[in-house]
Curated annotation (Swiss-Prot):
This is Vicilin Jug r 6.0101. The gene is LOC108986502. Expressed in seed (at protein level). One of its GO terms (cellular component) is extraorganismal space. One of its GO terms (biological process) is protein homotrimerization. Denaturation starts at 45 degrees Celsius. At temperatures above 75 degrees Celsius, begins to precipitate, and eventually becomes irreversibly denatured. Cannot be resolubilized in aqueous solution after being heated up to 95 degrees Celsius and then cooled down to 25 degrees Celsius.
Length: 502
């Protein structure tokens, strides 16, 4: 009797549901996502796992739809006229409607997705704007993994720095025929050299693992890939790219056995592991002292939160790696910092002399404001839903546009060198921001407010000439604030689209 495959009714229902939602897209915007999830939750034929999978599919469809809309909008804008002029030509004629310094969910590509987690990679910075070409060869990626999961081995054609934002993991690397296991936790930073085989587990039984990575490609500028040796069909093993004759000779194994080995794995990059497997892989941590970053050539992780904060008061705390101490980050010209801004408070304004700051929002909400001299005054820059607004004033000499962006968990924003910036937490919750400073060597942070602000260092005559205002009054204003770096935030936070940022 011929075999007839049976398609589960739950799969048919899910396919039909997504098709219905795709039809609704013509008439609806965000409400379609809400409707899709509502339908998922009320499907009686679905068990809880199928309902969760259905809702994740809704999210994925919604993100892909937003990305398509953005791509279509960009294509239509390419045909629009651009202002002539040397400066604008040199900067790539920046006339996009989007705020070029803020990145949201739809700006991430999902490279890995399984039932147990996902890996997202932020688009290349210069895809958004040539203004960001100074950080073109850096990429940001985010790993999320469910409790007690295994992330399969891979190596990357990029230098890799990881920061454990949430959870507990065991990271295993193989170098020079030596395996090293490192139990890491929230606040740990670890450098993984290009080409190093690495795999990890989420060893926590309850908490999700959330790791933020910054990568500097070493092969193709601005592009990187993960190479999976261990695997089969999903993840695909790079061994499968070789002929069977070469594999038989190299591994000294018959083809039929090789076909079984490299065709077995179909579960994906992030898979569930048993408690026994997790326990076994997490108990072998190396006992070599963690001497990094205070000299030596160790590859051990270093916990940022075990250092004393470089700035601390009731309005926030700032933890920073010192480029002079962190020898492993020196050749990358990179510094890592973490700001915890108390709810209702703010950091800055300040600017960096050399470093461009790439910031990832970990927890909380708020917004940032930045002064930018590069953007066109025509149009309304940054009028992106949920992101920002902008303003530019015409003056004799340099003119600065206000860049403002709303901040939520998972968002990325960039403050280029020399650009004055302030970050404000909502009044409801602390705002936690992870920062990677590119071009960190020799960088100086110049405060524009607080007891050590740069104006206080000006000579009396310089103050009068610069502001066309009595020096005494200038000093009174700039010496009013006796705190440093972190300050009380605005008493009234701005609104966007009729709703307050908080």
């Amino acid at each position: 009797m011929a075999f007839k495959p049976k398609i589960p009714i739950a799969l048919l229902l899910l396919t039909s549901l997504l098709a219905i939602c795709a039809g609704l897209a013509l008439a609806m915007q965000d409400p379609e996502l809400k409707q899709c999830k509502h339908q998922c939750r009320h499907q009686r034929q679905f068990d809880e796992q199928e309902k969760e999978h259905c809702q994740r599919s809704c999210d994925e469809y919604h993100i892909e739809k937003k990305a398509r809309e953005r791509a279509e909008r960009r294509r239509s804008e390419e045909g629009s006229s651009r202002e002539e002029g040397y400066e604008e030509e040199e900067l790539g004629g920046e006339r996009e409607e989007e705020n070029p310094y803020v990145f949201e969910d739809e700006d991430f590509e999902t490279r890995v997705r399984t039932d147990e987690g996902r890996i997202q990679v932020l688009e290349k910075f210069t895809k958004r704007s040539k203004l960001l070409r100074g950080i073109e060869n850096f990429r940001v990626a985010i790993l999320e993994a469910n409790p007690q999961t295994f992330i399969s081995p891979a190596h990357f054609d990029a230098e890799l720095v990881v920061f454990v934002a949430k959870g507990r993991a065991t990271i295993t690397t193989v170098r020079e025929e030596k395996r090293e296991n490192f139990n890491v936790e929230q606040g740990d930073i670890m450098r993984i050299p290009a080409g190093t085989p690495v795999y990890l587990i989420n060893r926590d039984e309850n908490e999700k693992l959330y790791i933020v990575k910054i990568l500097r490609p070493v092969s193709v500028p601005g592009h990187f890939e993960a190479f999976h040796g261990s695997g089969g069909e999903d993840p695909e093993s790079f061994y499968r790219a070789f002929s069977w004759e070469v594999l038989e000779a190299a591994l000294k194994t018959r083809r039929d056995q090789l076909e079984k080995l490299f065709g077995k794995q179909t579960q994906g990059v992030i898979i569930k592991a048993s408690k026994e497997q997790i326990r076994s892989m997490s108990k072998h941590e190396e006992t070599t002292p963690r001497i990094w970053p205070f000299g030596g050539d160790s590859t051990h992780p270093f916990n940022l939160f075990h250092k004393r904060p470089s700035q601390s008061n009731q309005f926030g705390r700032l933890f920073e790696t010192d480029p002079k101490e962190c020898k492993q980050l020196q050749d990358l010209d990179l510094m890592v910092s973490f700001a915890n801004i108390t709810k209702g408070s703010m950091a800055g304004p300040y600017y960096n002399s050399r470093a461009t700051k790439i910031s990832v929002v970990i927890e909380g909400e708020g917004y940032f404001e930045m002064a930018c001299p590069h953007l066109s005054s025509s149009g309304s820059r940054g009028q992106r839903e949920g992101s920002g607004s902008s303003r530019r004033r015409s003056r004799s000499g340099p003119s600065y546009q206000q860049i403002r962006g709303r901040l939520r968990p998972g968002m990325v924003f960039v403050a280029p060198a020399g650009h004055p910036v302030a970050v404000i937490a909502s009044r409801n919750k602390n705002l936690q921001v992870l920062c990677f400073d590119v071009n960190a060597q020799g960088n100086i942070r110049f405060p524009l407010a607080g007891k050590n602000n740069i104006v206080n260092e000006f000579e009396k005559e310089a103050k009068e000439l610069a502001f066309n205002f009595p020096a005494r009054e200038v000093e009174k204003i700039f010496r009013n604030q006796d705190q440093e770096f972190f300050f009380p935030g605005p008493s009234r936070q701005p609104e966007e689209g009729g709703r307050a940022f908080e």
